[in-house]
Every structure is written in structure tokens, then in C-alpha cells.
UniProtKB/Swiss-Prot annotation:
It comes from Aedes aegypti (Yellowfever mosquito). Residues 905-940, 956-976 have a biased composition (Low complexity). Residues 1-31, 494-514, 821-866, 905-977 are annotated as: Disordered. Belongs to the FHIP family. This is FHIP family protein AAEL005291.
Length: 1042
């Protein structure tokens, strides 16, 4: 029947002649070569068109009558009717084009004699009755009828649906199409017609009743029938390509109609869209996803848009999820609620929950990656709400919460699982959800038991001098301070002799302070302009700008929360007394409040009777000023009130750490003799109450875990635990870890600031405080990476490696296309047989490429954050981030970048690397245009650059022959302790053999990352302080800041 399938569809009043069958040549003399003859409606005589229309119908009707008398349909009969019908459609389009011309206001509509004849003579009904009897030609005739209806619905300005001669045969052909399997061309025409009908219904909502009542009549049983448009469209919702897209668009349009009428109940009750969707999406599409993902790149950590495009099963699942998100956005409230209920009860709990709770590590990685993809894709608050409910639900999973399981996996020794977990929590934080933040951290900090009593008054106060900024900058390792000084000297030298500096003129042209540092510090960093010595990305101002943007965005979201999470200085009793004073006897109530305040102060002073008077007075005055503040802005309503009562049973435990203003003094105190221990402790407490303490050396032999009994919660405890192993973690673990902590610091929550950004506030938790861990890392790096020429050169190579990685990301599209156009393919492993193969499929994410690497790809499930994801806001850290399975950390990976695994390939690798490095001018122009997104290490708005992080350098794997497949990803070759014998190559191509040990190289990378991260924390601290002061100035009178 190809001769009928090639029948022309006249669009925009053009006629396509010809076909693929033998009968095409008989079409009224039309060309058989597929030529197009354009129609000009202005040149056609309306009377002649009408006469021709009547003649074609008369001839077609004669053929219909003759075939009915012969009791059989011949090939020539069907072809003749179709040919005449084809000409009739053309004449109708010409007439409709003439009628649709814009006329004068108030002028009568031009006549449409052809259309009137079509309706008055019931031609459509006669065609339908004849088409039913055409036997094996029924599909071909139906195809022509669907084309006719489509043209009339889409081009006619008349409301044809209100005319019974048009509506009755239309409903007949739609009703007869239910539960039928048609050829692809008929399905396509049917979906197009349904789409056009939905457009008309959207424009004329009152016509929706015609289809509801008519479908009930078609059922004939007196009961309710499914809405016929839904019944026909639902089977195509999960189809691939344009057919599925048109079906989903049509359903969305039709669902938007009941939102304006009281038809949502009918659709929700009598249509099967929700059960069908979740049967296919939950049990069908998700179960087809690979159960295990074969990760080949060392820095992979999440599914990207290209992964979705490359893997057909994932594309179908995401299309279905996008459709669900759109339905929730536009549908009637009852439909929306039913859809959310089905999603929770039919997909999240029975399908996704068990998948996340699997015990196999590979399955856990894939399930968490899918969960991360789902959270990043949904945008509607209703969907986000049920996802949060899924994470916090205890009843559905035998008293075990999904969120608690995810927190436990942060401590995993598997690098890939740890990276995926960190990435997932970064995605959860990007939701800025109050419930998530409350469960992760805030509920453990609300009562402020982690802060000694004498310091709690500082929690809600602003540090106007921002001493924490200086603290973070001073915590940088000594080796990095030396390198930064050398860079500053070189930059000053560049201002006077830029040309010689660009060429790396050698030690003779460098100042004395920079002669012993390798040449790369003077050459490579000039790509960044005059401020290259301050930071890898640009300068400290860029960190400030990025920090302010992130904080403002986060603050805007947190302003919508139901509660204000601040430390409450008054107990529940005081709040109750205050409420009584307003409702009853005001004098008596106020007296009770004052009595209680005095008693609290007496209890406080009684604990420190041995302390000097001045210190006690200062602490007492501080608490008195805090206690006298109005409780109007305090948090504490509903079920959260139990977390806010001040407890005094463990105040003696807090006394132990009162001396650590910054968390370090008390550690040295405990090592002194018992005779002077108490005196030193009280002296330290006195000093910490009066002024900021300077950072002193930390005794690493001290047991840091014996300092207190207050827990910060499993989430923060897991984060601190990972931070303590910073120098031994994989490079990409550290990048995600630092980004996650920076993301926490963006929140405008003083309780979080007290443990992250306020070194002047000590903590009494059962783990080392955040600032203690930073000091430990500094001393560890200083001890193992001394300030010498060899260490400076190792750090120099590490910085060069990281900055060249940044350049490769800037030019990732060019490098990817030129190096390996076939990279990033998702392949099934050997032995897999596709959809009919084993249940546990494995998808090979051999190289996850950025979205821009697929020019033809139009799929983007992360549209909502598109404007954020376009920036290179990833600061220094987001440049080199993706987890590997288990690989050596730090500079153990530099060898693959520079040498490709052997000295024989050094020259080719370096030449390719050099070709991929942008010119200094181009680099500076790019960075200056993106200065607003330079500094942050992690965050939801940096997804695109992190997704794009992959290696594009053409080199073979370690110890293997040269690769013929273009660029290869960084691949794990075994355990994290593999012995890699290699030499480092600096940026100029010279081989630096045997520089330090592998441990020193790892420490060098850790030092660079730590140095940049501390700058970011300093910028965040400074901007948080400015924003808090601005808020107080706007809400209080000048001079009343406290």
C-alpha cells in the first residue's frame, strides 16, 4: 500500500505530486517526480473551485455506489476515490485560505460554498460508511480521512465541532480507532489530528462538553466511558521521537482545559492516565535502566545530559518524568493530587526505595545516580515535596529512613560511592528545603549545646571586623604562602617586562626570592593576567563576587521558610510567662520574667565563682544583654520547641572547652602539669572572653575525640570525618567535599556559621571542630611538605596540572570534536542482549561528555537551572571533579595528563596539550567575561562545568601501548595503593625526574586545593558579614547593632 502512503499532504497550500507506486501517475496528470506546484488562492475563481469540488465528489460518489453494488472493493475503485478526495482537500484549502483573509471590522464573513456543500450533503458521514467496507484497504482510506479532518480542524476559522455533520463522523472514526493497532503512518496522522483537536479545545474550552457527553453515548451502556481523547493518546505517551512528543503535548493541552472548567474530577476519576503512566514509567521504564553502570573515567560522579541522550532507556524514562512534571504544573488540582499519590505509592516507595537500599555497591551507585538525576530534573513544588517525603519516610522502609542511609554512605571507603553520595547531597542542598536542612543539621544545633554558655551570646551577633577572614587566610599551608609570595614577585616583575616573562626568560631575570622555583610559575600563570599570583581562577574579588551571588540566591530561598532558625536565648518558660503577661496581669507576668532572668544569671555566675571578677562580669553582662533581648524574632513554635529549651544538666561538660576561643589553646593546656592545669584553664577562659586568641601550634598527639559529649548529627560528623582524611582522599573526593561544605556556608543561618565561619566560637562536640580540623591539615602539610626548593617545584607542577585542566575545560568542545568524535558513547557490555537480555544490564559510561558535544541533541532535562549552569562558576575546584572507582589521589594522576604513561609518548602528549591551551589573550577575555562565576568550588549552579569534566588529552593508558582510539579517560588500574613509577613533566615539556615521593605529590595537590578553598571560605565569611550587617541596618535604627 505504499502508493497510498505516499499520498500528498497539502501544507501551506502546496501540492506534492508523485508517489512510490504504479498508480501515482494517474493522479490527474500530476508530476510523478515529486515536484511541488504552489497554489495562489487569489488566482482561483471561487465559482470554478466550487464547481470543480462538486464534480470531484460526484465522480467519487459514483465509484462508491458502483463498488457497493458489486459487493467488493477493487484496487481501481479505492484509488479513484482517494484521488478525487485528494483534489477535494486541495480545493477546500484554497477556499479556507481565501476565507481566512483579514477583512474590515464588521464585514460579513466571506462565503465558503465548498465547505457548506461538504456539511450539507453529509459527505464525511458517507465517506466513513464506505471506508468501513473497504476491507484490506481500510487503513489506507482511514489515513486519507484523518488527513481531511486534520486539514479542516487546523485551517478553518469556523467552529466546525459545533456542526453535527462534522462532529458525528469525527467521533465515529475516533471511537473506531480505540484498541486498534495501525501502521505507523496511520498512527502518526491520528496523533496529529488529536493534537489539533486539543489545540482547538484549548482555544474553545466550552467545546469540551461535546466530547464528554458524546463518548458516553458511544459507550451505549449508560455508564461513564473514558474521555476518548485520553484513551487514544495514552498508548503513545511513552513512544519515542516526534510521535511521543506530540502525544504528550496534546495531553498537556487537554489537561489544561479542565483547569478552567469543572471537568478535572471527571478526568481524574474516569480516565486511566495516572495508572497507565506509572505502570509504564515506574515498573516499566525504570526497570529497563541499567542496574550497574560501568564507570571508566576516574572523575565520573553523576549522569549528564549526554548520558541521557546516548542511552535510549534513560531517554524514555526522562521523557516520562518531564511529562509528569509538566502535568503537575498545568493540570486540575484533583488530577495533580492523584498523579502525586500514584507517583509516591506506585513508583518512589515500591520501585526507587528498594533500588536505593540495595547492598551491592555497584547497584547503590547506579540507584543513587538515578535519584540525583530525578531530583535535579523535577521543578514543581509538589514533586519536590513528595521526593522529600520519600527521603524522610520511616514507615515505608521498616523504620529506616532513606536520608539516613545516604548519610551513612558518605563514610564509604569506595571512592565512586562516596563521590556520588557527596554529589547527591549537594543536589539536595540546592533545593534550599527547610525540612532537609532541619534533618541534616539544624535540629542538632538549635539548642546550641555545642557552644559553651559564655560564648552563646555571639551566635546571633555579627562579627563586624571579620576576624575570621584573616583566620582562614592564615590557615593556608606555609608552602602555599611561599608560592603565593613568589607569584606576587613574578607578577610585579611582569608589569615591567611582560614580554620576557611570557617567554620564561629564566632565573637570571627573576628576583632573588623566585630563582629557586621552577619556570612554570613564571610562565603558565601569566595566562591569567596581572593577578595570577592570588588564585587559580582570577583573584580574591572574583571569590567575593561569586560568594555574594550564591549567598543572595540562598537567602532569597530561605526567606520563604516557615521558621527563623536562630539561637533562642530564652527558655520555653520565659516565652510562656511573656504570653501570660500580655493576656493577664501585666505587672505580675513581667515580675515572673525578671525573677527567672535573675535566677538564670545567678546560676551562671555560680558555675564560675573561681574566675576573675572582670571576666565574670563580662560574661554576665554579655548574657544579660542577650537575655534581655526581645523574643519576637526567636525561633520556637510547634513541635520544634522541644529542641530549644536550654539545658543545664551538662554545663560542666561545656566548661571543659571554654578556653578554646578558636579551639586550640585547651589542647596544649591539658599537656601541662596537674599543679598548673586549673590555673592555665581559667586563664585561657579569661583571655577568650576578652579578645580573639592567636592560632598556636597544635599537639597532634592529643586525643581530639575526648573533648565533649554533644553530637553535631550524623551528617556533619560524616563530613568532618572525611575532612580529617583530606590529605589521603582522592583528589575528586576533596573537590566535592570542599564544595559541599562551602554550600553549607552559603546558608544565612547563624547556627551553621557558628561551626563553619566563626573561629572565635569554640565547640564542645564529640568530634574535632571544623577549625581544629583545618589547623590539623595545615600542620600536617607543613610537617610533611617542608618549605624547600623541591617542595616548591612539586607544588608548581601540581598548580600547572590543575590550571591546564581548566584550560582544557574552557576548550572542551574543540578538544572533544578534534580528538575523538566518538567519545562518550554508552555501550552495553559483552554478552548483553539489549531489551531481551539479562535483567541486570550494564551501561558503559566510558567517557561522559558535556552537553555541548552533541550538537543535534535537543534534550535537556535540567532546563530550570540553565542560566546558572552556563557559567564557569566552578571556581578552582569544579574544574577537576569526577569520582573514579579506586585510584591513587593527588599527583598520581598528573602522570597520565602529562606523559600518557611512558617516556616514549611524552613529546606527543605535550604537543597535543600545548595545542589545546588557549592563548593568554583568549584566556583572559574568557575569564573576564565570566568573572561572576569564578570562585565557588561546588553548588547546584555549577552543574554543567562539573558534568563536562573529563580528560581530552590523547594519550595511552599507563603501562599500555599507544591508544588508537583517540583520547582515553583516567581509568582506575587497581587498588588505591598501586605503585606508579613515573616522572613528572612540567608545563614547558622538560622532564623532572624523581621529584619527591608519591606522598609528597599528593600533599602538594592537597595543599593547592586547601589554599584555594580557604580563600573561598574567607570570601564567603566576608560577604555573609556584610549581608547580615545590611539586614540589621535596614531593620534597626543606626547605632543599635548588637
Amino acid at each position: 500500500m505504499s502508493w497510498l502512503r505516499s499520498s500528498p499532504l497539502r501544507q501551506s497550500f502546496s501540492k506534492a505530486g508523485g508517489g512510490s507506486g504504479s498508480g501515482a501517475s494517474s493522479r490527474g496528470g500530476n508530476s510523478t517526480n515529486g515536484t511541488v506546484r504552489a497554489f495562489d488562492a487569489s488566482e482561483c475563481d471561487p465559482k470554478a473551485c466550487y464547481d470543480s469540488f462538486c464534480i470531484h465528489w460526484q465522480q467519487a460518489f459514483e465509484i462508491i455506489q458502483r463498488s457497493e453494488n458489486n459487493r467488493g472493493q477493487s484496487h481501481d475503485d479505492v484509488l479513484g476515490v482517494v484521488t478525487h478526495l485528494d483534489h477535494m482537500v486541495t480545493l477546500l484549502l484554497v477556499e479556507l485560505h481565501h476565507c481566512n483573509k483579514v477583512g474590515l471590522p464588521g464585514a460579513p464573513a466571506p462565503p465558503a460554498p465548498c465547505l457548506e456543500h461538504l456539511l450539507s450533503e453529509n459527505l464525511l458521514d458517507k465517506l466513513y460508511e464506505w471506508g468501513v467496507k473497504t476491507g484490506r484497504y481500510a487503513n489506507a482510506v482511514r489515513l486519507e480521512q484523518l488527513k481531511l479532518y486534520e486539514q479542516l480542524v487546523s485551517h478553518s476559522r469556523h467552529q466546525l465541532l459545533v456542526h453535527e455533520p462534522f462532529l458525528r463522523p469525527l467521533l465515529k472514526i475516533l471511537a473506531s480507532s480505540q484498541n486498534e493497532i495501525y501502521p505507523p503512518d496511520v498512527e502518526k496522522r491520528l496523533v496529529i489530528l488529536l493534537n489539533q483537536l486539543c489545540v482547538v479545545l484549548m482555544q474553545n474550552v466550552h467545546l469540551l462538553d461535546l466530547f464528554f457527553f458524546s463518548t458516553a453515548q458511544q459507550n451505549g451502556s449508560g455508564g461513564h466511558a473514558n474521555f476518548i481523547i485520553f484513551s487514544l493518546l495514552i498508548p503513545y505517551v511513552h513512544q519515542e521521537g516526534s510521535l511521543g512528543h506530540q502525544a504528550r503535548d496534546a495531553l498537556l493541552l487537554c489537561m489544561a482545559c479542565p483547569r478552567r472548567l469543572d471537568r478535572g474530577t471527571y478526568i481524574a476519576t474516569y480516565s486511566s492516565i495516572c495508572p497507565v503512566w506509572f505502570t509504564r514509567a515506574g515498573e516499566g521504564l525504570y526497570s529497563r535502566l541499567p542496574n550497574q553502570i560501568d564507570i571508566k573515567t576516574i572523575d565520573w560522579y553523576r549522569i549528564t545530559t549526554d548520558d541521557v541522550t546516548e542511552l535510549q532507556e534513560l531517554t524514555l524514562f526522562m521523557n516520562s518524568l518531564e511529562f509528569c512534571n509538566a502535568v503537575v504544573q498545568v493540570a486540575h488540582s484533583m488530577i495533580r493530587q492523584q498523579l502525586l499519590d500514584f507517583l509516591y505509592q506506585g513508583f518512589l516507595v515500591p520501585v526507587l526505595g528498594p533500588a536505593v537500599l540495595q547492598t551491592n555497591v555497584e547497584s547503590q551507585i547506579s540507584a543513587m545516580a538515578y535519584l540525583d538525576l530525578i531530583v535535579r530534573s523535577v521543578t514543581e513544588p509538589g514533586l519536590i515535596q513528595i521526593v522529600v517525603k520519600f527521603l524522610l519516610d520511616e514507615e515505608k522502609f521498616d523504620g529506616q529512613r532513606i536520608l539516613d542511609v545516604l548519610v551513612e554512605r558518605l563514610n564509604s571507603n569506595d571512592t565512586r560511592l562516596c563521590m556520588v553520595s557527596l554529589s547527591l547531597f549537594d543536589t539536595l542542598l540546592s533545593l534550599n528545603c527547610e525540612d532537609i536542612m532541619l534533618e541534616l543539621a539544624l535540629k542538632y544545633l538549635l539548642n546550641c549545646q555545642h557552644v559553651p554558655i559564655s560564648h552563646r551570646f555571639k551566635v546571633n551577633r555579627v562579627d563586624p571586623y571579620s576576624n575570621a577572614v584573616e583566620y582562614f587566610l592564615n590557615t593556608s599551608p606555609d608552602i602555599m604562602k611561599k608560592v603565593n609570595n613568589v607569584l606576587n614577585i613574578n607578577n610585579n616583575n611582569n608589569n615591567t617586562s611582560q614580554a620576557s616573562s611570557m617567554l620564561g626568560s629564566g632565573p637570571s631575570s627573576m628576583p632573588q626570592g623566585g630563582r629557586n622555583v621552577s619556570k612554570t610559575i613564571g610562565a603558565n600563570w601569566n595566562h591569567y593576567g596581572n593577578n595570577t599570583g592570588e588564585t587559580l581562577m582570577a583573584n580574591y574579588q572574583a571569590y567575593l563576587l561569586e560568594a555574594r551571588n550564591r549567598i543572595v540566591q540562598c537567602k532569597h530561598a530561605c526567606d520563604q521558610w516557615n521558621n527563623v532558625y536562630r539561637y533562642q536565648k530564652l527558655s520555653k518558660l520565659v516565652n510562656n510567662s511573656s504570653s501570660l503577661s500580655h493576656s493577664g496581669n501585666g505587672t505580675a507576668g513581667s515580675e515572673d520574667v525578671r525573677t527567672y532572668k535573675v535566677q538564670m544569671i545567678k546560676n551562671f555566675l555560680a558555675e564560675f565563682t573561681t574566675a576573675p571578677d572582670s571576666a565574670v562580669d563580662m560574661a554576665g553582662d554579655g548574657d544579660r544583654s542577650s537575655l534581655c533581648q526581645s523574643p519576637a524574632g526567636m525561633f520556637g513554635t510547634g513541635h520544634h520547641a522541644s529542641h530549644l529549651m536550654a539545658t543545664t544538666s551538662k554545663q560542666l561538660d561545656s566548661l571543659q572547652s571554654l578556653g578554646d576561643s578558636s579551639g586550640y589553646e585547651s589542647l596544649n593546656i591539658t599537656n601541662l602539669g596537674t599543679g598548673s592545669e586549673d590555673g592555665r584553664r581559667h586563664e585561657a577562659w579569661k583571655v577568650s572572653s576578652v579578645k580573639e586568641e592567636t592560632i598556636v601550634d597544635l599537639d597532634l598527639s592529643e586525643d581530639l575525640f575526648a573533648q565533649g559529649t554533644v553530637s553535631l548529627g550524623p551528617f556533619l560528623t560524616a563530613i568532618w570525618g572525611k575532612l580529617q582524611t583530606f590529605t589521603s582522599n582522592c583528589l575528586y573526593v576533596n573537590l566535592h567535599l570542599t564544595g559541599l561544605i562551602s554550600h553549607l556556608a552559603w546558608f544565612p543561618l547563624p547556627l551553621l556559621h557558628s561551626i563553619l565561619l566563626r573561629p572565635d566560637i569554640p565547640t564542645t562536640s564529640d568530634t574535632p571542630s571544623f577549625h581544629q580540623v583545618l589547623k590539623i591539615l595545615k600542620q600536617q602539610i607543613d610537617a610533611e611538605l617542608p618549605d624547600c626548593d623541591e617542595s616548591l617545584e612539586i607544588v608548581d607542577v601540581a598548580r600547572s596540572f590543575l590550571v591546564d585542566r581548566e584550560f582544557r575545560l574552557i576548550n572542551m568542545r574543540k578538544n572533544a570534536i578534534e580528538s575523538n568524535p566518538h567519545s562518550g558513547k554508552l555501550l552495553l557490555p559483552n554478552g548483553a542482549t539489549g531489551a531481551s537480555g539479562p535483567v541486570s544490564m550494564t551501561s558503559n559510561l566510558s567517557q561522559t561528555t558535556p552537553m555541548q558535544l552533541t550538537p543535534s541533541s535537543s534534550y535537556d532535562p535540567f532546563k530550570r537551572n540553565d542560566t546558572k549552569r552556563k557559567s564557569i562558576s566552578n571556581s578552582f575546584s569544579s574544574i577537576f571533579r569526577r569520582p573514579g572507582s579506586s585510584a591513587s589521589s593527588g599527583l598520581a594522576q598528573v602522570f597520565q595528563f602529562f606523559t600518557g604513561g611512558g617516556s616514549s609518548s611524552n613529546s606527543s602528549s605535550i604537543s597535543h596539550q600545548s595545542s589545546s591551551t588557549p592563548s593568554p589573550a583568549g584566556s583572559q577575555q574568557y575569564l573576564s567575561s565570566n568573572s561572576s562565576g569564578v570562585s565557588s568550588f561546588m553548588g547546584s549552579s555549577r552543574r554543567e562545568s562539573r558534568e563536562a569534566e573529563t580528560q581530552f588529552v590523547d594519550h595511552p593508558s599507563i603501562g599500555g601501548p599507544p591508544s588508537s582510539m583517540g583520547p582515553t579517560s583516567l581509568t582506575s588500574t587497581g587498588s588505591p595503593h598501586n605503585s606508579l613509577e613515573y616522572s613528572l613533566v612540567n608545563i614547558n615539556g622538560s622532564i623532572v625526574g624523581g621529584i619527591g615521593s608519591e606522598r609528597q605529590r599528593d600533599l602538594a595537590v592537597s595543599a593547592v586545593v586547601l589554599d584555594e578553598w580557604l580563600k573561598e571560605l574567607a570570601a564567603i565569611t566576608q560577604e555573609q558579614c556584610i549581608i547580615m550587617i545590611s539586614d540589621q541596618v535596614s531593620s534597626q535604627k543606626p547605632g543599635k547593632l548588637s
